[in-house]
């Protein structure tokens, strides 16, 4: 389907983004709304950051992005740990909260931060399309297992024309079958 849509950029990006969100939904349930929240928040913060005049306005927006992202990450990863530590230091008891750790939260949090930091440093210009940004943050091959890809490395590739030569196709098929063979052994 992706190759059939090779001349329709928006349809191709929409297709992959929807499937990325679907796969994330299947692994994390309604926590895919968290992925959407981080995506929308950082997209608009980067837009504001690019238009902001003055050092302190830009700095404030990047600090807001850091606070939102790291705050969510800290809540899901460290609330029970810190609650237990504080309770033991105070000589009390702590009942762990029922907090489900969303799959890949560290990866998409730091990937989204990479974008806002790159925009803050003026290494890249902010994307004008929320869909392109959602594609970058939710790209399923790296969403749940990494690696974290820098925005300045990934984003320029989004608009590149899709071209697959016979040699590239053959190499891809070879790598897929090699991987399947290695898994079977």
Residue ranges and their predicted role:
Residues 1-185:
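Membrane-embedded transmembrane alpha-helical bundles that form the catalytic cores
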